[in-house]
């Protein structure tokens, strides 16, 4: 659990589409949810613009939101991996997911 929380505290969010650096100006006016179909409460309740503002204002809430999001994302990822292991198609699922999840948004 160290990696998701440490990266979250530094403004890096893991999503189903790739990695978001919340400190980038790109997110300043993006009022869409952190992750519309995310697994946690914070994913739909806070916008990327608001979270970016919290990071730049050095609010502790930013660290909490990012950590909760990343932990929920990793729980989702492990559940998905488990489903594909049981289904017997993990070896085809893994390379596709690694490529998708390592994309910088």
Task: For each feature predicted by the language model, list its residue ranges.
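C-terminal extensions of enzymes
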Residues: 35-105
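Glycine-rich phosphate-binding active-site loops on the catalytic face of alpha/beta enzymes
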Residues: 1-14
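Amphipathic alpha-helical blocks and their helix-capping loop/short-beta junctions
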Residues: 17-42
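Hydrophobic transmembrane alpha-helix bundles
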Residues: 12-24, 98-105
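Short amphipathic alpha-helical segments, especially helix-boundary/capping motifs
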Residues: 13-14, 24-28, 52-58
């Amino acid at each position: 659990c160290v990696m998701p929380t440490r990266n979250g505290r530094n403004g890096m969010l893991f999503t189903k589409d790739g990695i978001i650096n919340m400190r980038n100006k790109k997110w300043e006016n993006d009022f869409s949810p952190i992750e519309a179909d995310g697994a946690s409460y914070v994913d739909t309740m806070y916008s990327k613009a608001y979270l970016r503002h919290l990071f730049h204002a050095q609010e502790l809430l930013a660290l909490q939101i990012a950590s909760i999001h990343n932990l929920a994302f990793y729980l989702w990822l492990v559940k998905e991996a488990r489903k594909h292991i049981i289904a017997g198609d993990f070896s085809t699922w893994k390379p596709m997911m690694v490529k998708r999840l390592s994309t910088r948004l």
